[in-house]
């Protein structure tokens, strides 16, 4: 684990309630030291790697805070993952809704909130598998010898969406 993502992050650009992309090459989410640390960690041997982010990495189409607000940083992260790790799973939150996203062979599970549901509007995204769930939810993960089963459950423990990953 390392320092919080927001500690080094450049300012977001906001217009009329929407966050816009910051394409400034000096804009950062992690800062230089955290990027160096992350690349060193990705060079290590893992059977399976899980990366946690407070904000969504794959999602692009909503108006809220996400890695794609900093497209150069997002591309840098996705390229690092692509260059170093085949078996990677992303977890994120801070959306007050849950969803499973997939870009190429990379999956992201977003889950929140356990106690404060989001609005009921229908959200779409080109990387979204199925739909998002604005009700209270949580993520579950079961790890077996060569398979990880991960998904989203509602507050009653019912599975809303899930995926199975072999590694």
Give names to the regions the model predicted.
Residues 3-167:
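Metal-dependent phosphoester/phosphodiester hydrolase catalytic core
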């Amino acid at each position: 684990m390392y320092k919080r993502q927001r500690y080094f992050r450049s300012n977001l650009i906001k217009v009329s309630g929407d966050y816009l992309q910051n394409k400034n090459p000096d804009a950062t989410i992690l800062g230089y030291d955290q990027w160096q640390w992350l690349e060193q960690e990705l060079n290590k041997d893992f059977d399976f790697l899980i990366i946690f982010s407070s904000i969504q990495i794959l999602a692009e189409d909503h108006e809220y805070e996400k890695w794609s607000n900093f497209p150069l940083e997002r591309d840098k992260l996705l390229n690092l993952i692509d260059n170093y790790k085949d078996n990677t799973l992303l977890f994120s939150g801070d959306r007050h809704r849950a969803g499973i996203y997939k870009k190429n062979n990379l999956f992201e599970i977003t889950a929140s909130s356990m106690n404060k549901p989001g609005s009921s509007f229908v959200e779409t995204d080109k990387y979204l598998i199925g739909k998002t769930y604005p009700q209270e939810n949580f993520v579950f993960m079961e790890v077996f010898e060569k398979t990880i089963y991960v998904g989203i459950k509602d507050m009653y423990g019912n599975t809303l969406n899930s995926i199975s990953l072999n590694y």
